[in-house]
Each structure stands twice: as C-alpha cells, then as structure tokens.
C-alpha cells in the first residue's frame, strides 16, 4: 500500500498541466503516451488509465469543469482495462479474428496524431510564406482554378485522415515513423504526382500513389498530400470526391499560369 501511495504521489507530481493545454481527451492521451515513452500501438492501458483518472481528479480538486468528452474517454479506458484483465485462451490469441480491445482507440489516436502532423506542417509553411515578399501577378479573369463543386480543402483533409485511420492496427504498424530531415520534399512529390498522373492517362485516386501492402512512411504520405494541395492551388491538378470522406480522385489539368513550390 505504501509503495502504491508513493507511486500515485510521484504520478501526481507530473500532472501539473492545465486543461486548456489540450485540444481534447485524445490530445491528453497522446501527451501521456509520449511522457511515458510508450509505443502508441502497444499502450500500457493500466498505467495510462491510472494517470488519466488522476488527471481528472486533479481537475475536480481545482473545481474546474470537465468536458463530457473527457469522461467518455475515461469510461472507454476503464472498459478496455477490464477486458484486458479477463483471461484469454491461448488458442484465441492466435486466431485471425481476435480483436485487440485497444484497436479502436489506437486508430483514433493515430488519426488525431496525423491531424497534428499535417497542421504543424501547414503552420510552418504559413510562417515561411509570411517572410516572403513577391510582386503580385496580373489577374487573368478568364482563367479560374477550383476544386470540383462540393469539394473543400477541409473535406480533402478528412478523407486523407480517414484513409490512414481505416487500416487495421497490424497494417498501421507497417507505416513507420523516421525522423530524417528532408527525406521527402513537397517539390519532389509534386513531380512524382504529375509524372504518375501522366502514366495513368491523367486520372487516378490519391491512394494509388502508395503500396499499403508494403512499408509506407507517414512522412511520405503527409508530404504527398501537401504536394497535392499545392497542385490544386495553382490549378495543375484538380481533386474531387463522389461523396464526403470518399476517395480523393486526382485529375491532371496541365500547366498553369502560376508555378508550384
């Protein structure tokens, strides 16, 4: 008991952050996972649940309102923890239809983390663009470049995140994260997209750029998505969807007046 109290006390010392530091419960969970240096695909549910609940208790002690979404994730963690405490037959563990209780939560976390990575890249690009000054080009009123009707950048981002999140955990593990500066650049991926589109008679799905049966790095997919947005912006490629969050169809439109990055 003394050891448990000591551990809880040590945990509480680390829970000095505030609610407004996080965008939501998934943001908090990612923080705890990184703080404990855990693999996002192999979360130690008991430890994370304990710290997460301690955090909510701390908020209550400070008399701060806790959003309902935080309580929903707390209930989810407790449910996963209880399932993982149940004995599992060895034969069941090796069956193909065995479902890890953590799978849905892991996919939510991976999708949320992907949003963060894309948002961070947009922030860097925006900051870099603010430091540049260029002469405005004459407006050609006869030429307009738009994504297809009903398709917005926000919908493209949601479809992109859905593409990454729909993979099962085992397959997601194949998407490796490597911190290698400038391994992929937007300029190179722009050239790759245009070349590949020409090879496919000018039309193809964004997902066809990658071999998800092999190893695909998140950095590669994110950079390719940013390259697509840049090509759409300058009018060299159009993007469309038959339905919200559906596959992203790319169509090569040829050279535009404005050069891409």
From Swiss-Prot:
Quote the subcellular location field of this record. Answer: Cytoplasm
Protein family (similarity comment)? Belongs to the ScpA family.
Q: One GO CC annotation, please?
A: cytoplasm
Q: What is the lineage of its organism?
A: Bacteria, Bacillati, Bacillota, Bacilli, Lactobacillales
Keyword Protein biosynthesis listed? The answer is no
Alphabetically sorted, this entry's keywords are:
Cell cycle, Cell division, Chromosome partition, Cytoplasm
Q: What is the residue range of the signal peptide feature?
A: none
Q: How does it assemble?
A: Component of a cohesin-like complex composed of ScpA, ScpB and the Smc homodimer, in which ScpA and ScpB bind to the head domain of Smc. The presence of the three proteins is required for the association of the complex with DNA.
Q: Which organism is it from?
A: Ligilactobacillus salivarius (strain UCC118) (Lactobacillus salivarius)
**BP GO terms, sorted:** cell division; chromosome segregation; DNA replication
Top-rank taxon of the source lineage equals: Bacteria
**What name goes with this protein?**
Segregation and condensation protein A
Q: Which Gene3D superfamilies match?
A: 6.10.250.2410
């Amino acid at each position: 008991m003394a050891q448990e109290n000591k551990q809880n006390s040590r945990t509480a010392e680390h829970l000095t952050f505030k609610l407004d530091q996080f965008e939501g419960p998934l943001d908090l969970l990612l923080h705890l996972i990184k703080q404990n240096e855990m693999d996002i695909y192999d979360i130690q549910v008991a430890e994370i649940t304990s710290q997460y609940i301690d955090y909510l208790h701390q908020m209550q002690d400070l008399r701060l309102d806790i959003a309902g979404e935080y309580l929903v994730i707390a209930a989810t963690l407790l449910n996963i923890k209880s399932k993982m405490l149940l004995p599992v037959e060895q034969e069941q563990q090796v069956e193909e239809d065995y479902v890890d209780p953590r799978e849905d939560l892991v996919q939510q976390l991976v999708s949320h983390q992907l949003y963060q990575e894309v948002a961070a890249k947009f922030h860097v690009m925006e900051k870099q663009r603010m430091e540049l000054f260029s002469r405005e080009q004459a407006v050609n009123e006869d030429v307009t470049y738009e994504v297809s009707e009903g398709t917005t950048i926000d919908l493209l981002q949601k479809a992109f995140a859905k593409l990454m999140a729909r993979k099962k955990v085992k397959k997601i593990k194949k998407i490796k994260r490597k911190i290698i500066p400038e391994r992929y650049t937007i300029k190179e991926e722009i050239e790759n997209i245009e070349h590949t589109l020409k090879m496919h008679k000018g039309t193809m799905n964004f997902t066809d750029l990658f071999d998800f049966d092999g190893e695909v790095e998140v950095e590669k997919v994110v950079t390719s998505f940013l390259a697509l947005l840049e090509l759409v912006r300058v009018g060299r490629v159009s993007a469309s969807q038959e339905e919200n969050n559906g596959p992203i169809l790319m169509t090569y439109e040829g050279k535009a007046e404005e050069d891409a990055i």
